């Protein structure tokens, strides 16, 4: 598999390549005015890069990717335990990135609810941030459907860049094996990362 640095370069390069392509579609095909077309392009490309760098399909491994989350890597431990590596749930083009986004949303909501409950146990009352967050997300998606769609498409393309690179290497190795050329490698060390004891 490509290492983490290669995946990052693929994400950045494909994100940069998307800018003129998406802007052209927004202005010519969808006939959006300049400010709206540029905003939607930036939402799509920003989500592409965010997805590729922070919400990578390799979050199901103890790798350099989850270290980018710093101390918040613990948020992804349950995901690692449940989702097998290179499985449909981690490396598909549409379902996997949306699953990671939904998982992250549910974890944040759960932490907000748990925090409010914990503070209520010691007599502190806090606003219902979980409900407020859900309402704000609903309001934003209802008010800005084009930007929401651009974000979701970009989130999927960022993950797809990673997944397609992995698939290409796997298929390339199979092709070489069919020719009698053996390439040895282990996906657990594909990003040259040595797991820390946590």
Question: What is each stretch, according to the model?
Answer:
Residues 1-198:
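N-terminal membrane-targeting hydrophobic helices
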């Amino acid at each position: 598999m490509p290492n983490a640095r290669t995946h990052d370069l693929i994400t950045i390069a494909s994100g940069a390549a998307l800018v003129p392509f998406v802007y052209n579609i927004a202005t010519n095909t969808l006939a959006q005015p300049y400010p709206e077309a540029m905003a939607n392009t930036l939402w799509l490309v920003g989500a592409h890069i965010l997805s590729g760098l922070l919400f990578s399909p390799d979050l199901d491994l103890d790798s350099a990717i989850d270290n980018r989350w710093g101390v918040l890597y613990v948020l992804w431990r349950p995901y690692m335990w449940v989702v097998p590596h290179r499985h449909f749930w981690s490396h598909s083009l549409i379902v996997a990135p949306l699953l990671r986004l939904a998982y992250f949303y549910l974890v944040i909501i759960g932490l907000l609810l748990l925090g409010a409950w914990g503070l209520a146990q010691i007599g502190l009352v806090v606003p219902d941030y979980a409900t407020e967050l859900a309402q704000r997300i609903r309001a934003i998606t209802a008010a800005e459907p084009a930007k929401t769609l651009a974000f979701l498409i970009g989130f999927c393309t960022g993950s797809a860049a990673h997944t397609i690179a992995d698939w290409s290497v796997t298929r390339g190795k199979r092709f070489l094996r069919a020719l009698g050329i053996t390439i040895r490698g282990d996906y657990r060390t594909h990003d040259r990362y040595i797991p820390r004891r946590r």
